[in-house]
A protein has these predicted regions:
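A general structural signal for well-ordered alpha-helical segments in protein cores
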Residues: 10, 24-27, 66-70, 108, ...
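Contiguous, small/hydrophobic- and glycine-enriched helical/loop subdomains that border
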Residues: 108, 112-153
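Glycine/serine-rich anion-binding loops at beta->alpha junctions
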Residues: 90-117, 137, 243-253
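Short beta-strand scaffold segments in enzyme catalytic cores
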Residues: 15, 39-43, 138-143, 149-150, ...
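Conserved, helical-rich catalytic subdomain that frames metal- and/or nucleotide-binding sites
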Residues: 51, 142-244, 256-259
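ATP-binding N-lobe of GHMP and related small-molecule kinases
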Residues: 1-99, 117-127, 148, 162-164, ...
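A short, flexible low-complexity segment enriched in Lys/Arg and Gly/Pro that occurs
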Residues: 67-86, 113-114, 216-235
Length: 259
């Protein structure tokens, strides 16, 4: 028997830095799920001596967000460990990794939601989000399964944003972006804090209007530091004819249309 669930990508329509707390950058961002780009997480029955995770990942199992979630969840209930003696996890990967699209965080959240269901943990979305936040900053957004949300703090504060469905197309060039290096560059050469008034204005504006009225640099505070580290992260260099925005710390670009 196999059960499965889609694990969607996300884009950041805007990403603004509002301050620093305990060494972490505080952000204000609009996260939007990309409905046409997703991995599939499956639980497949069998007999296994240990937790088994299969998929085309760019890291060891012990470093994978799904494995980290398993370790957290089995501390909550013995049912989790028992379940994965009789099931393995398979992830059919489509979302590019390390691309600013939240693939690892989405996989983690999808796994948590599925385990909460199949093991009858009966944990609320808020409780699941708290667990997810200890694994990755973007995990809480995916736990809530909102199509659009305003996200703040280090990613743990997620508030649903109601807007019409959006048609989002992504493009991920074969360019590696190191998130740590990009934040270092931002801090040393591009540091600025978005005002609370500006954040409130952005949080109340529809994504399509932000896309139509802002440009790639003003929408994402991490784009210029990313570009300073890799000059090829330029829509013109990549032959992107349509107006494109930059997601997270890259390297993915995206366009938005009304659905």
């Amino acid at each position: 028997m196999t059960i499965s669930k889609k694990s969607y990508a996300k884009v950041n329509v805007f990403l603004k830095i509002v301050g620093i707390r305990d060494g972490y950058h505080l952000l204000a961002s609009r996260f939007v799920r990309v409905k046409n780009l997703y991995d599939i997480v499956e639980f497949q029955s069998g007999s296994f001596d240990k937790f088994t995770l299969e998929g085309d990942f760019g890291c060891k199992t012990e470093q994978n967000t799904i494995y980290k979630a398993y370790i957290k969840l089995k501390e909550i209930s013995s049912k989790v460990e028992e379940y994965f003696k009789a099931h393995k996890v398979i992830v059919n990967k489509v979302i590019p990794e390390f691309a600013g699209l939240g693939g690892g965080s989405s996989n983690c959240a999808t796994f948590i939601l599925m385990v909460n269901d199949v093991c009858s943990l009966n944990l609320s979305k808020d409780e699941l989000s708290t667990i997810g936040a200890t694994i990755g900053a973007d995990v809480p957004f995916f736990i809530y399964e909102y199509d659009s949300a305003n996200v703040s703090g280090i990613g743990e504060i997620v508030k649903k944003f109601d807007e019409e469905p959006l048609d989002i197309n992504t493009y991920t060039p074969k360019i590696a972006c190191n998130t740590g290096d990009i934040f270092k560059s931002f801090r040393s050469s591009f540091y600025k804090e978005c005002s609370q008034n500006e954040v409130e204005k952005l949080f109340s504006t529809k994504s399509i209007d932000i896309y139509n009225n802002m440009d790639i640099k003003s929408a994402n505070d991490l784009y210029e530091p990313a570009l300073s580290l890799n000059k090829d992260l330029n829509p013109k260099s990549l032959n992107l004819d349509i107006k494109s925005f930059f997601s997270g710390s890259g390297s993915s670009f995206f366009t938005i249309l009304k659905n």
